[in-house]
Amino acid sequence: MSLSKQPVIVIVGPTAVGKTKTGIELAKKLNGEIISGDSVQVYKQMDIGSAKVTQEEMEGIPHHLLDLVDPDDEMSVARFQTLARTAIDEIAAKGKLPIIVGGTGLYIRAILYDYQFTVQAENKVLREELEQFAQAEGATALHDRLRQLDAKRADEIHPNNIQRVVRAIEVAMSGQTQVSGSEPSLYDSLLFVLHMEDREQLYDRIDQRVDLMIEQGLVAEVDRLVAAGYRDTKAMQAIGYKEIVPVLEGAPLEPAVEQLKRNTRRFAKRQLTWFRHQFDGNWIEMGRLSFEENFKIIYDRTVGFLKAVKSE
């Protein structure tokens, strides 16, 4: 597999900020294909709760890394990295532009940077990096990294127990070696971080999205997954699913929906914190201007970037 300096566009941001629509519009105008950078959308049958793009929303644009595995088949960062890089090569071989769109920052960094994986469950270099990260950013930030990898394990370990959190990350990453943020990307990548300065505006959009999920049949989707035997899988610990399971067991729906909204808002806040620390990109404020105006900014910067890459 080639890791030459292939141009890649990356669109990240918190949930409900407009990544999907932005990516599709960009792909339509620039002959691109989408690679999903989401750790839940890789699972089959988990559509509504993961806000997976629908066939209608795709508008004919090919999407990669959706519906890859069943909910009882765990997706590791290493496996995702391999699949995503293969997709980039395949898209580029067709003369098209790879566009990565998603909110799982760790997965996206693993695609772009020289993360190495070994079969070891313990890795001294990784452990030292994680301990330094905890000292610099705090125990909560470290715990958030574990949550991105293994939400269930994160629930079992107190954030202040740094040693256990570090060890859990080591195990979850199967010896992944971290790189510093100053390392160059393996690709000629242009990265956009979509966000909203007005948190209440973003939170309102999140609440509306959750209400729409309920209308679209989220409870029935979770019911089907539980009936299929997936109740206790790691995938079902994802936000959007774990909150609904108690409803199937007799708990009232309204408090569960409110809990889902709260959890999603907290997750969006953690995503933004992570992006600030881990990504040096173009931050696009999506709340003040119209979508069309914001898209023009993104499109113009992308065209300029591609021209510059071509002239090198």
Swiss-Prot record:
Residues annotated for ATP binding in this entry: G13, P14, T15, A16, V17, G18, K19, T20
Reactions performed catalytically: adenosine(37) in tRNA + dimethylallyl diphosphate = N(6)-dimethylallyladenosine(37) in tRNA + diphosphate
Pfam family, one: IPPT
Record bears the keyword Signal: no
Site feature location: Interaction with substrate tRNA: T104, R127
Residue sites binding substrate per the record: T15, A16, V17, G18, K19, T20
A GO molecular function held by the record: tRNA dimethylallyltransferase activity
UniProt xrefs under InterPro entries: Dimethylallyltransferase, IPT, P-loop_NTPase
Entry keyword annotation includes Magnesium: yes
Spans annotated as Interaction with substrate tRNA: 38-41, 163-167
GO biological process: tRNA modification
Assigned keywords, A-Z: ATP-binding, Magnesium, Nucleotide-binding, Transferase, tRNA processing
Cofactor(s) listed: Mg(2+)
EC number: 2.5.1.75
Top-level division of the source organism's lineage: Bacteria
Record-annotated membrane-spanning stretches: none
Subunit record text: Monomer.
Known role: Catalyzes the transfer of a dimethylallyl group onto the adenine at position 37 in tRNAs that read codons beginning with uridine, leading to the formation of N6-(dimethylallyl)adenosine (i(6)A).
The family this protein is said to belong to: Belongs to the IPP transferase family.
NCBIfam families membership: miaA (TIGR00174)
The name this protein goes by in its record: tRNA dimethylallyltransferase
